[in-house]
Amino acid sequence: MNYSVIMAHLNECGYKVSAIPSTTAEVGFLTVELEINGMPVTLWHIAVTELSKMPSFLLAEPSTLPRLAHTAFYPGSKFASICVNVPDAVSVNFECPELAFEESLKRHVSLLSQALTDSEWNTKELLREFEAGWLNIVEPDIPPFLCLTESETPEELCVLKPSKGSVGLGKYHLGYAEEAVPDNIFSPINQLLKNRQAAKGNGFVIPLSVLKPAPWKKDELTDWYLDLLSELPTNVQTKLTQKFAQKRSYEFWLIFNAQTPSGITWFGIHFSQKNAGKGRKTLPLKHSHLAEWVLEPFIVLTFNKERIMPWSGAEQSLTSKKLCLLDVVP
């Protein structure tokens, strides 16, 4: 692909584009220097031999900018990928690839401009993609936590260990409220509880009225958790400090749920003592107490209508609708 023509075209369109050679090609990368809302922004494109899709660009040095929605930053990397939605089909003329680059750049710049100039929109979009952001700080070898309650009030959970040698749901920690377990011994829930041992810890469901975007990096989790506690409603704060925080244990599982623009999201933080030999301790609620604990984010899976119904093709918004059946006789 002739990148000289592409560079010339983009420069004519007003972009400041430069080429960087690689070890194998004269043009290994393109860089595009921008200024958005007074902030310098640099985009990188990795050169390809031919176009099979819309050209993509990476955001360089994302840590120098505010946290931006629709970007994925990976610890240790100097770049973030940019998720540019393509609502309209684009016809790519392979004889004129420079037009595809122009269209792609327009979309990248438009997205970044909105994120950097409209903080309210950016925050809303970060909350919409909260689960993706949370997953970004969860270690790959940390299994999900299976929560069998969908309580909208603070609730204590019984936590069970994974079943030895199990696969699938059996290898997850499981939390349930005692009154939420059906008496029917043939129920799927009872089958999940069967032959499991209790964990040496306590679990609590904490509903949130205010949620902030997920931490960008795992080492931000401690401060993010304390900020989360400071925004709790009074009734939740009272139950947390006067009841839950009186429990002593070697480990805790906090299960949070909150409303986001994309629906109710569930996520969790596991607390384990750095030195279990010092005996059981209460749930850490202050920065000074957290020095003795290891915090590990994890994914929460729930058995509720919001998660299960779409798998079968059901639409939850129809639950409050009335259905009229008509029998047409020829």
Residue ranges and their predicted role:
Residues 143-326:
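Glycine/serine-rich phosphate-binding loop and adjoining beta1-alpha1 elements at the start
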Residues 25-26, 114, 129-134:
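Defense-system signaling and execution modules centered on TIR/cGAS-STING-like, death/scaffold domains
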Residues 329-330:
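Rossmann-like NAD(P)H-binding beta-loop-alpha module
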Residues 1-14:
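Amphipathic alpha-helical segments
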Residues 12-40, 297-323:
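Short N-terminal secondary-structure initiator segments
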Residues 126-150:
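Long, charged, helix-prone linker segments
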Residues 16-87, 99:
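Compact alpha/beta protein-protein interaction domains typified by the UBC
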Residues 64-126:
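Glycine-centered motif in EGF-like
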